Amino acid sequence: MHKHINKESQMPPTAHRPLPTRYVELHARSAFSFLSGAATPEELIAACAELNMPAMALLDNDGVYGAARFHLAARKVGIKAHIGAELTVRSQTSDIRRQKTEGRKQKAENQVAQTFVLPLLIRNRTGYQNLCRLITLMKMRVPKHAKPGECAVTLDELAAYADGLICLTGAEDGPLALDINHRGPREETKVTERLIEIFGRENVYAELQRHFNRAEEARNHAVIEIARQLKLSLLATNGIGYATRAQRQVADVFTCIRNHVRLETAGRLLSINSERFVKSPKEMAGLFADLPEAIANTVELSSRLEFTLKDLGYEFPKYPVPPDETMTSFLRQRTYEGAHLRYGRNGEFTRAQKQIEHELKLIEKLKLEGYFLIVWDIVEFCKRQGILVQGRGSAANSAVCYSLGITAVDPVGMELLFERFLSEERGEWPDIDLDLPSGDQRERAIQYVYQRYGPRGAAMTANVITYRGRSAAREVGKVLGFDDETLGRLSGLVHTWEWKDPKDTTERQFKDAGLDL
């Protein structure tokens, strides 16, 4: 039985050993861990920059939704943005028994499923591809409004897509913690040993966090012992849930909203303290003064994580062309077929041909033939089906788009500037917008794309829905236990937020709404 551990006893004396001065936070959640993380990616990077930390890893729940914003914010201040995710994993076994019911034999299968959260870090481009495959697998086989735990990958799927990924054993909801808490000592390393088998011993790190929690520290002792038995490297993280200590209050509100409870009744659903903020290397070294290797390993592991989003690049999809054609030749043929129809064979065609050749050479150089052919294919389908379709925006500046029938404005005759649409110097991809009717006709076009290119070869852009001021005020008011009348006044106040004279203040506005501050 573990002894009582207080705040002081968790931090061994440090006078006899030097403290590491370098540390990289490799386990942080953002607000893209919906209603779990309380800080935006930009706020996490700002806290990291203020502490002169050279890198940070973002691991959101079951997705990489915040990765782009995290990467862009990090690039602006010279911080390396490591990417990963916390994946929900289901380890499942079957217990088959037979029982007799009304004289007939009935086979009943009891499935015992253990679900845990597995932090994964991306080591290289292959790892990014594999993590995305795992996320896609889990998302596509569950209902749209799946309950927590329904969306999960299996250990066998992890084994199929483990290349390029680094595995951490996680915190209180990780595989090793669940083994320690719920299984006997003979089985307590079963899942961890399977993870070693899947990822390789050098790619599995025993994660340790210290938030002045007795149960957590007792678990840490067991993790350290198991790590030494299995020859795993120790890794210190702070399990970041918010950028600053003050944001803990936001995290508590999110916890209440997620669990549909008021703050006064949330109880043990809330974190016991506000320690999950971005801490300095000095603070983290002090927390792990007895385990300097756990701090040093953060720097070592960070150096192994070669991948950032700037290495991803983009490969445009390939259009299926006849066996005797290339995408370049097929696009050229379709373009000139349309150009002869649009411009005829007079002097106007000669003038247009010069512009078309200029555009085709740039399209070929940038390897964009597939993109133009796919858009052309969608437009052709719509025309065959009698669906109104029209390209718009800067695509109207392209003679190739005009010749392919994507747009309706002659850019040569109108002397429009092609480089406004596509320019090698600008380094931006072209954007061809297609206007379609709403309703069934639009849906028919979408379904054609899925059928033509396959369910894994096409996707719709997802929108992240965020709280506006009025809805946010109502949700926070519910958490604080306000009655309906007060909620109405509060949301109305935020909805029309303005200061009409210099004497107006936030405090006065709330008092005018009848709120006792």
Language-model segments: residues:
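Alpha-helical scaffold/interaction cores of sigma-54-like transcription cofactors
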Residues: 2-93, 100, 110-517
